[in-house]
Each structure stands twice: as C-alpha cells, then as structure tokens.
C-alpha cells in the first residue's frame, strides 16, 4: 500500500479582519458563519496542547484515501472557535469517524442528510467546561458548540463535504452545523455510554454516530418506566414508518426527571435497551398507512426491528432538571454506518 501524501498548509495574509472573513467565505471554507482567524500561533497552541506535530497523520479517509493531519484539524478547530483544550476532543472525533465501520464517505455524501452526533464522556467534560444540563441537545456551552462545529468544518474543508459537492443532502438538518453532547454522568446511577462501550468508567472518550435530527417527545403522565419507554418506542416506530425501516444505532436522550423514575424502579440502561429492543418493531404493512403502499409488496406481515440487538441502542443521560421530555435520535441508514467510541488520545490504526 502506498503511503498517502500529506497535505501542506499555505500561509495567507490580509489587510484587515473583514477581508479575511470575505476571502474565507468566497473560498467556501466556512459554514456561512464568521470564523476565528487560524493564525500560526493559534494553530500551534492547539498542536502543543495535544502534543502532536503538525504532520502527525490522524488517519486516512478509507474510500477516497484522503490523509488528515493534525495541523489541518487544528486549523479548522481554531476557525470553529475551539480553545486549545478542546482540540483533543476534536482529534478523537475525527479519529472515530475515520474508522471503516462508520462509513464516513457514505454518510456524508448521501441524499439522506445526516449529521455527525458527537457524545463526550469522562473527566475531560469538566476540564473544558462542557454542560450536560439545560439545552443539552442545542447550543448549551462554548466547548460543545465549537467542537461540533469543528467536526463539520473538518468535513467541509478536508473532504469537500459541502452542499452540492460531496454533500448531496436533499434537506439536511441543523445538527449538521454542530451536534455535540456531553453525557451527565454525575446525576445518575447509570454507567456512562463510554463505560458501557469500552469498559472503562474513568476514561475520557468520544462516541460518533451518523445521525438524523433529534425527535423530541414528552411524557409527564406516568412514573412507570415501561410506559415512559412506550413513548420513546412510538417515536422510533414513527421514524421506521416515515423515514427508514432498517435497524441500526438509535440514540435516546433521557433527562433527569424521567431518569428519576427509572432509578426509583431499579431500571438500568441494560433494562432500557432490552425493552426498546423487544418493542420497537413494525410490520412492513404499516407503510401502507403512511402513503407507501406500493413498497409493501408481499412482505406486509414481515416484522422489522429497530435494533439488531439491544446494545445497538445508545442511552444518553443529558438534559435540564425539569420537564418530562426526551429525545430519539435516529440513525442515518440502519447498520450501513455504525457508532464508534474511541478514548481521547487513542489511535485506531496505530
């Protein structure tokens, strides 16, 4: 196998900040929002924080063979507004996306319009000021917003994942600008997502998932875990009818008010996953009721599950303290892309 050639960065100079912004916009290097100038010092600060040389190869995009270096990721992290302390999380998210089971090219080139959900676990959440509470799935804090945005800028500027170029999304969704969540590990007896997926409850880690936009739900009328989960299941089944029937990595976000009912009843994350696995199923014939009769064919009585196994479900503890709300985050296209979890500082192919 021929080693990929490493990209080199050009040094640019501008008369003023307005000229810089307009040049970056004109080149298609932004997401439509203003960027932070990626000065030599700012980029070097990110690299120094992570102890990475500029030409360190973070990975190679498996389909197109594009080499992604630490310097290129640092440039886009600075542009997104990241501090140097945020940079290791961005590097880890990029590392996870480059894993072959994630199918980065397919997910980012599809007309389906998915974004990249980034979930952060471990001590680094507090070290960089991430919030797991109010507005957890929206703009909640600087670190979450900038890390999610950095991931998008990396895709656009290093892999041409821009609308009308590699990105062929028919609609897309707002999470494609930034979609980063820190899990609430303190206000729950549940094991963290990272602890469940890599077996270490103390490590800082990042999980990435090719995800559609969140579907918010509410159930304040029961304290029974099964009834609460029936609402989540109904949302998953609606996605199977309206969008994609194929099983994959669904994520559910459960805030404190609902989590308290699970805690009182002694339900673990494993119990949640098992219940959803058993109940989130539809018959193909149900497509007839949502205008897809011609796609039913002779498989009307065939049953499809949302998950291939219980562990396909990502259960994320996050959200503000009040309100019986939750969210289902559907996968892009079933098992075509798999969620990937990587410890901060790890290298998949080393």
List each model region and its residues.
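Non-transmembrane, aqueous-exposed alpha-helical and coiled segments at domain scale
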Residues: 1-350
């Amino acid at each position: 196998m021929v080693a990929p050639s490493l990209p080199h960065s050009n040094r640019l100079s501008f008369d003023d900040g307005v000229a810089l912004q307009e040049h970056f916009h004109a080149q298609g290097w932004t997401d439509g929002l203003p960027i932070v100038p990626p000065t030599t010092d700012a980029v070097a600060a990110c690299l120094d924080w992570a102890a990475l040389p500029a030409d360190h190869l973070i990975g190679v995009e498996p389909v197109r063979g594009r080499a992604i270096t630490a310097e290129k990721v640092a440039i886009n992290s600075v542009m997104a507004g990241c501090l140097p302390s945020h940079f290791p999380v961005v590097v880890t998210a990029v590392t996870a996306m480059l894993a072959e089971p994630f199918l980065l090219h397919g997910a980012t080139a599809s007309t389906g319009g998915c974004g990249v959900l980034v979930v952060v676990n471990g001590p680094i959440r507090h070290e960089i000021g991430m919030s797991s509470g109010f507005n957890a799935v929206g703009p909640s804090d600087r670190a979450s917003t900038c890390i999610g945005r950095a991931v998008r800028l990396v895709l656009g500027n290093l892999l041409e994942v821009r609308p009308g170029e590699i990105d062929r999304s028919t609609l897309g969704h707002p999470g494609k600008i930034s979609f980063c969540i820190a899990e609430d590990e303190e206000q729950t007896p549940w094991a963290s997502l990272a602890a469940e997926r890599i077996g270490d409850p103390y490590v800082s880690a990042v999980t990435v998932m090719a995800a559609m936009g969140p579907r918010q739900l509410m159930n304040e009328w029961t304290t029974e875990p099964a009834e609460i989960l029936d609402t989540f299941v109904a949302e998953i089944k609606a996605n199977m009818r309206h969008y994609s029937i194929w099983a994959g990595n669904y994520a559910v976000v459960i805030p404190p008010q609902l989590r308290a009912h699970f805690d009182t009843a002694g339900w673990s994350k494993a119990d949640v996953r098992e219940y959803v696995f058993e109940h989130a199923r539809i018959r193909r014939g149900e497509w007839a009721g949502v205008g897809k009769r011609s796609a039913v064919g002779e498989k009307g009585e065939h049953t499809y599950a949302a998950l291939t196994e219980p562990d396909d479900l990502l259960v994320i503890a996050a959200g503000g303290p009040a309100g019986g709300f939750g969210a289902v985050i559907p996968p892009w296209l079933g098992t075509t892309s798999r969620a990937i979890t990587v410890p901060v500082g790890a290298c998949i192919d080393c």
